[in-house]
Amino acid sequence: MMRGMGNMQSMMKQMKKMQAQMTAEQAALNEQTFTGAAPDDMVKVTFTGDKKMKDITINPDAVDPDDVDMLQDLVVAAVNDALTKVDEQTQSTMGKYTKGLQ
């Protein structure tokens, strides 16, 4: 009966170690930046790994007062591109911890 307790303690120790690794990797991921761009780099946006926008750059050629819709579309494209990169890196980094849990 005591033998089972040793295994349980070992398993708990491994779980705590894994949790610490996950926390450290998530923190490192949150510090990374990801830049997304619209076609021809007309709009670029930069996000952190925790999906906070840090910067937006709009090429002056993208600003046409007669075609605001185009600029809006470019911003959306750049934001979506950056967020896709964040999601892909998050899955790559953190996916090993959730593999088989879904």
Curated annotation (Swiss-Prot):
Entry GO MF terms: DNA binding
Record-linked Gene3D superfamilies: Nucleoid-associated protein YbaB-like domain
One GO cellular component term: cytosol
Cellular compartments annotated: Cytoplasm, Nucleoid
The keyword Cytoplasm belongs to this UniProt entry's keyword annotation: yes
Subunit record text: Homodimer.
Record protein name field: Nucleoid-associated protein lp_0699
